Structure formats: C-alpha cells, structure tokens
Amino acid sequence: MTNATNYIETISKELNLTVAQVSATTKLISEGATVPFIARYRKEATGMLDEVAVTNIRDRMQQLVELDQRRDAILKSLDERNLLTDELRSSILKAETLSKLEDLYLPYRPKRRTRATIAREAGLEPLATKLFDQGSFDVFEAAKEFINPEKEITDTDKALAGARDIIAEWVSEDATAREQTRQLYRSKALVRCRVLSGKEEEGQKYRDYFDWTEPLSKVPSHRLLAMRRGETEGILILRIHPEEEEATQRLERDFVQNNSPAGEQVRTAVNDAYKRLLGPSIETEMRLESKKLADEQAITVFAENLRELLLASPLGERAVLAIDPGYRTGCKTVALSAQGKLLHHDVIYLTASERERMDAVRKVMVLIKEFKLQAIAIGNGTASRETEQFFKQLQLPKTIPIVMVNESGASVYSASAAAREEFADYDLTVRGAVSIGRRLMDPLAELVKIDPKSIGVGQYQHDVDQNALRHSLDDVVLSCVNKVGVEVNTASRQLLSYVSGLGPQLAENIVKHRDENGPFKSRAELKKVARLGPKAFEQSAGFLRIRDAKNPLDASSVHPERYDVVKAMAGDLKCTVNDLMKDPMLRQQIRLEQYQTEDVGMPTLTDIMQELAKPGRDPRSQFEAVEFQDGIEKPEDLKPGMKLPGIVTNVTAFGAFVDVGVHQDGLVHISHLSDQFVKDPADVVKVAQKVNVTVLEVDLARKRIALSMKSNPELGSTSRSSRPSDRKPQGRETAPPRPKQNQAIGNDWFSQALSKAEKHQKR
C-alpha cells in the first residue's frame, strides 16, 4: 500500500468523508487546482465538498506528508548509525503522531553530555542495570565494585548516584512514560501565573494575572496568549504542571517493582527523573502545544473577522467625497469618480476660525456640485465626529449619505509600494483619504491592498505563529475574492493576484496587457496574456468578469468550459443565450436532466441556471449606512444606561468590540451578547454588523467602556463578569498545593523559577 493510499484512508476516517471524495480532491490539488476552483467547478468529482472541507483535506495531507518526511529522516539516521532493529523500525512505522515518533527516537538522538553520559563513561551502566532489575542484594556491596577514583567515583554513594542518573535518563526517555505523563498534563495540569517582584506598577494592564491559577484544559486561548505576552514583556512568570505527587506516583507504579533496597534506589531515580528531566521536558511540550492550540483559535477568530470585513456591503459605483479628518493639520479631502479615480484633492479646516469654516463650506459645496458627488466618506479616527457634525449641518440632500468608514490600515496603505506606484505625485495624506473613499465604494477591492494584520480585526495577532496566520489569512482573502468575482478590466494588480490560478506575476501581466492593448473584450482574450497558460486559464476564467462583453456569459460565473452546455440549451429552445438570460419563461422550459453527462451533473447544471437568472450576482448584502447618536462624541459623554447604535469592529473569543462613535471601542463581554447563553461570540455577531447597545460602565482611567446587547441589562454588572480574576477555579485548584512539612519551598519548580527570574531582574 502506497503512502498516498494510506493518507487518503486516514483523512477519510478523520474527516468522515468517503475515500472517493478524498481521493478526487487530493488528485485535483496535486494537479494544481485551487480550493475555490475545486469547490465551485468540480462538485461532481468531490461529491459537493465546500471550501472548508477541501481546505481541511489539503492541510491534513500536508501534515501527513511532513510526518512521513520526519519518519524517513529518523529511520535514515538510525540506520546509518547501526541502531535500527526490526522492533524499533516496526514501532517507528506505526507511529501516528509526531510526538510519538520523537519519543521513540529520543533515546537514540545525538545528545549533549549529560549526567547519565558521565556515569556511563565511569563504567556505571552495569550497576544501573542491576539496580533496575530490583533483585534482592546489598546495593552498597554491589556499588563497591564500581569505585574508581580516576573517574571521580570515590565511594559507594557516588557510584549509586551515577547509576541513578542513568536510570533517571532511561525513565525520562521511555516512550510509554512520556506519553502517560503527557496525558496527565493535558488532563490535570494547572496554569500558574504570578507577577515578578517589583513589576506590579509597570504591569498594571496584567494585574488580573498577578496571582492566577487555572486548569490548562479550561484556559481560553485569549487568556493564555495574554499571560504569555505578559511573560514576554518581563512582567509575569508562567508555569504549567500537575501536582507533583500524582505525577511521581504514576511513574513509581510503572517502574518500582518492590520495596527492596534496589527498589528504593529506583524510586529515588524515578522522582529525580520527573523533577529534573521528564517534568520540565513535558512542560515545555505543553507550553508549545497549548500555544499552538491558542494560536489556532486566535487565527480562526481573526480569519472569520477578516472574512466579514472583506465581504462587507459595498456602496457601489458612486462618486464619493472622502475625508481623512484632523484638527491642527486640517481634513484631507479628495473627490473620487464612480470608478475610484482621483479627481481633486484639498485640505479643509473645520475646528479653526469661523472664516476657515465658511471657506470649508464653500469648498465642499463646489466639489459636490462640480463632480456630482453622491456620498460622503469620513474616516473614523481623530476629529471624525466633529467632521460628521459639520457635514450634517450642511443639510445635504438625503440621497447623499454621510458614512463613517473604519480607517484602520489606511495609513499603512498610504505608505505602501502599491500606493506610491499609483499616486507617486501625491503625499501620504492624499493617499490615505483615497483609501478611505474607495473602502466605502468596494471594501474588498481596497482591503486586499493592505496587510490583513493592519486592519485591526485580530486577537493577539502579533503573538501567534506568523506563518500559520499568513497561510490562513491568504486562504480567506482568496476565498472572498473568488466568491465575489473580479472585473478584469478595472481590477487592481493586488486584487487580480488573489484570483484563483493567477498570483502576483500573472496579475501584473494582465494589467500590463490591459494597459498596452486596451480593455479585454472576452475571456478568450486572456489567453493572449504573457505566461497565462491553459492551466491558469482553467483555474481563473470562471472568477473573472468582463462587463459588456459580446458573449453575455463572460460577465457571469459560468465557466467557459460549460459555455457549450448553455448554447445547447438555447439552441434547443431556438433562442439566443442572451434571450435565455433575460426571459425566465424560457428558462422554465429547460429540462436539466437532458444535459447531464459524465462530467456535468445536476450540481453544475443547477449553478448554471442560477447564473442565467442573475449573471455575475454579488453575494454581498445591500449597503446600509450607520448613524451614531448626535451629541455623543467622546468617552466622557457616555453615561451608564445610555442606549446607542453602534457597529461591530472586532469579534474575539471573549466578546465583541463595538464602535459607538467616541473614538474608543467598547467591549460587549460574551456574557452580555444576548439574553440567552452564548458559547461562541461569532454565533451572535459579525464584524461590520450594526447593533444596538446599552452602556454599562465607563472607566476613563483605564480607557475601558463596558457595553451590553441584553434587552434589560443590570448596570455595572460587568465589573465582576468580565475579569478573569473573578473567575478563578474553585476548590483545590484555586492555588498551588501547599508544600509538605518535609518539602522545602525551594523544591517547588514554580517558586524556584520565580526566585530565579526575580534575581535575574535585579542584576
């Protein structure tokens, strides 16, 4: 059985899919198909798998390949050193996880010189073996035979100590012992966090974790990442371990056979193995494992927030006046055409003298009239509410909405290579205002130009695995761009680069071809683009739109490979494809089963019919502006009990942040998202969603605003429900175990580590 077959069967079982589904999907991926293409245009082959399922297959396949690569490297290393027995080879080939594989390899891994190594060099391994067998003999008499002053083994105590070091290493490297200890950590380890002495004032933002204990199995991802950040900043010290007594008792049951003198030597070695070797090793693993899990959860939150933001409702092709507000430096103002082209830029001053305000009124009214502007976009940063009030006082027609736009990342874009390339002759402030206006017109087209991490919808995004984050966010952007589709004759290079099958180089070639030869008149013309071969065309064509093309299907998501099916439908009804798209009565006469083939099944035919009814339909919802409450412009204006409109700016594992128009987002804790119990905030709210909230509490000193979405919330109730310090686990787990009378405080790992860290701080 080949590795590929093994992979397919493993994935099939893990994801509860048929072997045929997994096999077809992996084959398509290996042939260069993208996730959006497979999910959209190969439904018959995959059995209607969606993007999530296809992505899971792809990622799991990669993990299994990497596992086998590591397995092969280990087998090669052992074979080259003549250490590979048939039994060991069999165990390695059966290992299903990386941790199991590494456990098996650990005793044979080239290692630095250890206490056990030194003991072996002193000839103490036979003594260790004899002790480990735990027979009935005088251990001190046996140890006398191994006294060797030349090797610094000057008495029986040193001989026995060296033998115990060897036994301790055997125990710590035993694959079964490691796995059992690993499972103990996963089920019963406590996360213990304390503040370093003298760091209390500096670390006030971490004060909830100054003396914090919680089961590892229950700690939320955001809390673990917060504690780790505090540790990185030198404020906190974090440890993860179960009660030492339980861990050592389990090991003793496995390794100590009796209470003989030899058995007592083994018991001592086992305890040393756990404290000095196995415990710290598994703790390191658990830190990495829990961090990876927390990263995955944080990345999932970020990815879902990004998806909602990218798929936010577009204003559409309407000429816009965009403003990047400011006080001293004024408001950077730009007029944009319906296609987002910069028509004019200026600076207006709204918070200065009356003369300057009147000059601003004149400028704005001239711009609106001259360029027939149809909407006002205001960045939601500094001076945004004052700017909004200024425009409301102009009493513009109701057909011209005044919209607050989230400007997170606009400054990043304005300094980017893409912005410099497009607006080389304009400064950063003009570029930023343009980005704000375009973000209102089409959030997706504009946000793809910005590093997703700069958009401000993540949770500890700078603390998580950056490669995993980039991989996940790229998947989300790719998914969103292809879900909406791209107008090939107006799209930016950045937007085109996310189209299935293209990438940066082909996107650049398309723009270059468009600039040199004019707009594309058909999808078929894409084949003339340099280096855009048959595979790239297959993967991309269905997601690229050409408005007003001679063939109306070029403006739809019907793939060119299925044009003949639509032509056959039209031919059978003796009409044109255009007639078929315009006349629902004609479409009702189509009998889909007549057009089924081996490659074209009902899923594809159903998609085609939907496209004929609404060609190139935009899946994004209708645009609807949000107006903040007048007179509420800064945190000081907020009072408990106020009911306000707002917009969700970020969703996290512990709640949602909401902009109510005071330049500082408020938090709706998970316990206040609904009158019913909420397990996952993402089930209740989405980024860019419009909500109504009640102000619960305003802490100006800590810059915290507590909000509620409950119908009748208790004011001030968040002070106890939203802080982790008030949710410590009850019972024995609320604090580290007290040391026994014969157990010195210094023997506790945590106390030792804390003391060591504090000494390091003082140096």
Region annotations inferred by a language model:
Residues 320-322, 332, 388-391, 522-525, ...:
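Short beta-alpha junctions and helix-cap segments that line functional grooves
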Residues 100, 104, 403, 409, ...:
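Long, charge-rich intrinsically disordered scaffolds of nucleic-acid metabolism proteins
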Residues 145-156, 213, 229, 248-274, ...:
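Low-complexity, acidic/Ser/Thr- and charged residue-rich accessory regions of DNA metabolism proteins
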Residues 34-35, 46, 50-150, 483-622, ...:
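Accessory alpha-helical DNA-binding modules that contact the DNA backbone or grooves
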Residues 16-17, 313-315, 478-512, 630-668, ...:
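C-terminal accessory/binding modules appended to enzymatic or scaffolding proteins
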Residues 183-190, 323-327, 381-386, 405-412, ...:
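A glycine-rich phosphate-binding loop feature that marks nucleotide/adenosyl-phosphate handling sites
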Residues 53-56, 63, 67-77, 81-322, ...:
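Duplex nucleic acid-engaging cores and interfaces of nucleic-acid transaction enzymes
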